[in-house]
């Protein structure tokens, strides 16, 4: 059966899930998303300037994405096995001195999926492949300690908690086909120590993001009422304070 992008399994279209993930992303020149599915996260985030690499083995989804992003020069959409190409992209771009972010949302482990029997992907991962994926990330971080960042989604499991025990761990309550679940996120870096790739989704909830947006709107309104010289004094002060 052909899976349409709108109802693809595992899509990060749940309320606030994609925004929560994007808010953890540090600034990057290259964005790589293996297991991209219908690319909800990629569609909501700010594009990376150098390249945005979307990889999936589902040919129908890739055809859809190629059509959707055909007008962009900095999008690479591939219908390949990520195990064959992910390492190449990482080594090439980090080797060029680019800041590379890899976001992975692989099919979750069967043991943590309450609806595994009813809902399975066209292309699942074996336990061995999950181990290979986690090992690849750890190995590349040792090889490239700078300019390489990993984020991976999943449900909490013994395998992930043990192999990523020195990573940063976050949880978010969401609604899945099997009911309310706790979405887990592991990052190879501390998100609080890096300039974010974008600040559109700062705030843990929609209500919090709206509160921050209203505050920004009020401050901008006050700023626009000042004289040009006063605006420049504030601008220079902010530059010096933030070291930008």
What is the predicted function of each stretch?
Residues 1-244:
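Class I S-adenosyl-L-methionine-dependent methyltransferase catalytic core
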């Amino acid at each position: 059966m052909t899976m349409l992008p709108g109802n693809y399994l595992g899509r990060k279209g749940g309320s606030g899930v994609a925004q929560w993930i994007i808010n953890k992303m540090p600034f990057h020149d290259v964005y790589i998303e293996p297991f991209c599915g219908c690319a909800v996260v990629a569609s909501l985030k700010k594009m990376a300037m150098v390249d945005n690499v979307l990889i999936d083995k589902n040919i129908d989804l890739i055809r859809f994405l190629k059509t959707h992003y055909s007008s962009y020069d900095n999008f690479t959409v591939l219908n390949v096995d990520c195990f064959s190409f992910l390492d190449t992209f990482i080594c090439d771009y980090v080797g060029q001195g680019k800041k590379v972010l890899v976001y992975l949302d692989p099919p979750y482990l069967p043991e943590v999926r309450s609806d595994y029997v009813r809902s399975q992907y066209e292309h699942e991962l074996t336990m061995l492949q999950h181990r290979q994926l986690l090992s690849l990330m750890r190995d590349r971080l040792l090889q490239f300690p700078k300019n390489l960042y990993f984020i991976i989604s999943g449900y909490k499991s013994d395998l992930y908690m043990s192999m990523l025990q020195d990573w940063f761990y976050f949880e978010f309550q969401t609604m899945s086909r099997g009911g309310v679940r706790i979405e887990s996120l592991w990052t190879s870096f501390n998100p609080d120590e890096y300039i974010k790739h974008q600040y559109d989704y700062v705030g843990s909830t929609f209500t919090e993001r709206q509160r921050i947006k209203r505050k920004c709107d009020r401050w901008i309104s006050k700023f626009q009422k000042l004289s040009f010289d006063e605006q420049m004094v504030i601008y220079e002060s902010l530059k010096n304070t933030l070291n930008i």
